[in-house]
Design a protein with these regions (language model features):
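N-terminal short beta-loop-beta anion/metal-coordinating cradle
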Residues: 2-108
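Short beta-strand segments
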Residues: 29-30, 107-108, 136-137, 197-199
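Short, solvent-exposed amphipathic alpha-helical segments in soluble enzyme
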Residues: 43-48, 121-124, 211-212
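Internal, conserved structured core segments that host functional sites
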Residues: 101, 109-160, 182
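Catalytic cores of processing enzymes, dominated by hydrolases/peptidases
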Residues: 143-212
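Conserved active-site and cofactor/substrate-binding residues in soluble primary-metabolism enzymes
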Residues: 36-43, 113, 117, 173, ...
C-alpha cells in the first residue's frame, strides 16, 4: 500500500492498493449524509459493487476527515475469535467490463472536516485512474409519493457539457454539502463532472429507501 503524491507535489490522503490500467473510466461518487436521502445514492453504488464483484483499489484515510467521537469505529469479532476495529470507510472500487467505459466507484461517509483537502484526494483518484468524467449521485427529500416512478434529474456546471448531454445548468443557491464543494474542485481541475439526483418521498427519507 502506498500514499499518493498529488500533482502539486503534496502528499494526499489516498492509500492505493493497486494502480489499475483502465479503459476510458468514469468515476461515480456518492456520500452518506446531507445529500443521500433514504441512502439512495450510496445504496446505488453499493448495489453495483455487490452485483459486479468489484474490487477495492484505494481508500481515503479517514483520520483527517472525521471526529471519531461523532463517527465512532466499530468493533467486530472475526470467525476465528479475533477482535478487529472497523474505521469509517471511504473506499474506491473498480469494475472492468466489456463496455466502452470501466467504472471507478467511490463512496462512504460525508467527511466532517477539512473538505478542501478531502476534495483534493478525490481529484487525485480521478487523475490517477485517468477518468474521463466524474458523475456524482445524490438524493433529496421531495413532495412525491412512493407510487410514482422515481425521477432522476441531471445538471452540469459546464455550459458545453450541459448542452452536449442535454442537461440543465445548476440553479441552487444556499448552503451546500460535500458534493457541491467537490463539483467546484473538479471544475477547477478541468475534470468534466455532472450531477444526477433523485427525489425521495419525505416519509421514507430516513431509513434505506428500496424504491430509490
Amino acid at each position: 500500500m502506498t500514499y499518493s503524491v498529488g500533482n502539486s507535489g503534496v502528499m494526499t490522503e489516498v492509500i492505493w492498493e493497486e494502480g489499475p490500467s483502465l479503459q476510458s473510466p468514469l468515476l461515480v461518487v456518492a456520500f452518506e449524509g446531507w445529500f443521500d436521502a433514504g441512502e439512495c445514492a450510496t445504496g446505488a453504488i453499493q448495489w453495483i459493487v455487490d452485483q459486479h464483484d468489484a474490487r477495492r483499489i484505494a481508500r481515503i484515510d479517514p483520520e483527517e476527515f472525521f471526529d471519531f467521537q461523532e463517527n465512532r469505529p466499530h468493533v467486530d469479532i472475526t470467525a476465528d475469535g479475533e477482535r478487529r476495529i472497523k474505521w469509517p470507510s471511504l473506499d474506491a472500487h473498480v469494475i472492468e467490463n466489456d463496455f466502452p467505459h470501466d467504472l471507478v466507484l467511490l463512496s462512504g461517509l460525508e467527511p466532517r472536516m477539512r473538505w478542501r483537502t478531502f476534495c483534493d484526494s478525490v481529484v487525485e483518484i480521478a487523475h490517477d485512474t485517468k477518468c474521463e468524467m466524474v458523475v456524482t449521485l445524490g438524493a433529496m427529500v421531495a413532495g412525491i409519493p412512493h407510487s410514482r416512478p422515481a425521477e432522476v434529474k441531471g445538471s452540469a456546471a459546464s455550459a458545453e457539457l450541459a448542452r452536449r448531454l442535454g442537461l440543465d445548468r445548476p440553479s441552487y443557491q444556499g448552503p451546500t454539502g460535500i458534493i457541491g464543494t467537490l463539483h467546484d474542485a473538479l471544475d477547477s481541475a478541468d475534470l468534466p463532472v455532472i450531477s444526477l439526483r433523485v427525489g425521495v418521498p419525505h416519509y421514507v427519507a430516513g431509513p434505506p429507501n428500496p424504491k430509490g
